[in-house]
């Protein structure tokens, strides 16, 4: 019988924040394009070490409303917001990221910032 390692208690785990964003551009973008744009923005602005510390993680994207959610370490929220604000082009098309809000849970983020875009 294999023994599994103990899980970390909540006090020792990394704390995350979730950022709701909207993409405004010349055309509609796919999930993969947005995922790549977030990662490239993080790497170009924060660098490899900064991106590793911020731990940006793409959660969800609604292609119809062009809104989405990205997870980030709580100490680096403002850095990722800054990186997203610097995006001007996605795959050669003009586009910008508009940050709608930040929350500690996905449920509250959807209720507070994304409900007007049809998220449930």
Curated annotation (Swiss-Prot):
The keyword Cytoplasm applies. Its main location: cytoplasm. It is found in: Cytoplasm. One of its GO terms (biological process) is tRNA 5'-leader removal. GO terms for molecular function: ribonuclease P activity. Transmembrane segments: none annotated. It is an enzyme of class 3 (hydrolase). InterPro entries: Pop5/Rpp14/Rnp2-like, Rnp2-like_sf, Rnp2_archaea. It catalyses: Endonucleolytic cleavage of RNA, removing 5'-extranucleotides from tRNA precursor. One of its GO terms (cellular component) is ribonuclease P complex. Keywords: Cytoplasm, Endonuclease, Hydrolase, Nuclease, tRNA processing. Its EC number is 3.1.26.5. Belongs to the eukaryotic/archaeal RNase P protein component 2 family. Consists of a catalytic RNA component and at least 4-5 protein subunits. Part of ribonuclease P, a protein complex that generates mature tRNA molecules by cleaving their 5'-ends. NCBIfam families: PRK03717.1. This is Ribonuclease P protein component 2. It comes from Thermococcus onnurineus (strain NA1). The lineage of its organism: Archaea, Methanobacteriati, Methanobacteriota, Thermococci, Thermococcales. The gene is rnp2.
């Amino acid at each position: 019988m294999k023994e599994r390692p103990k899980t970390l208690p909540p006090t020792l785990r990394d704390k995350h924040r979730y950022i709701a964003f909207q993409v405004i551009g010349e055309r509609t973008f796919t999930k993969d394009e947005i995922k790549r744009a977030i990662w490239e923005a993080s790497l170009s602005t924060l660098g490899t070490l900064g991106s590793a510390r911020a731990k940006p993680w793409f959660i969800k994207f609604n292609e119809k409303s062009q809104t989405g959610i990205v997870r980030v370490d709580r100490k680096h929220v403002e850095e990722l917001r800054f990186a997203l604000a610097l995006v001007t082009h996605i795959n050669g098309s003009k586009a910008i990221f508009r940050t709608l809000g930040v929350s500690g849970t996905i449920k509250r983020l959807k209720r507070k910032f994304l409900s007007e875009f049809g998220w449930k």
